[in-house]
UniProtKB/Swiss-Prot annotation:
Pfam families: SERF-like_N, zf-met2
Source domain of life: Eukaryota
Annotated segments matching region Disordered: 1-28
Organism field: Arabidopsis thaliana (Mouse-ear cress)
Lineage of origin: Eukaryota, Viridiplantae, Streptophyta, Embryophyta, Tracheophyta
InterPro entries linked to this entry: At2g23090-like, At2g23090-like_Znf, SERF-like_N, ZNF706/At2g23090_sf
Protein name: Uncharacterized protein At2g23090
Length: 78
């Protein structure tokens, strides 16, 4: 005889829990630290890798008005 719906649900839940434990090793905080790959060369503040050029320019103009944007973020030079 086959199992009932409750038994199937419990088995699926247990299986998914094991998958989540295996896939979720490590901390989200560690992943966030690794994603901080853009760094201002003047003040060494880090930015997430998806930060736009506009945000980098805003930072340079607000925090380092005397320094050139390229001095802060060398990857922005064309």
């Amino acid at each position: 005889m086959g199992g009932g719906n409750a038994q199937k649900s419990a088995m699926a839940r247990a299986k998914n829990l094991e998958k989540a434990k295996a896939a979720g090793k490590g901390s989200q905080l560690e992943a966030n630290k690794k994603a901080m790959s853009i760094q201002c060369k003047v003040c060494m503040q880090t930015f997430i890798c998806t930060t736009s050029e506009v945000k980098c320019r805003e930072h340079a103009e607000a925090k380092h008005p005397k320094a050139d944007v390229v001095a802060c973020f060398p990857h922005l030079k064309k």
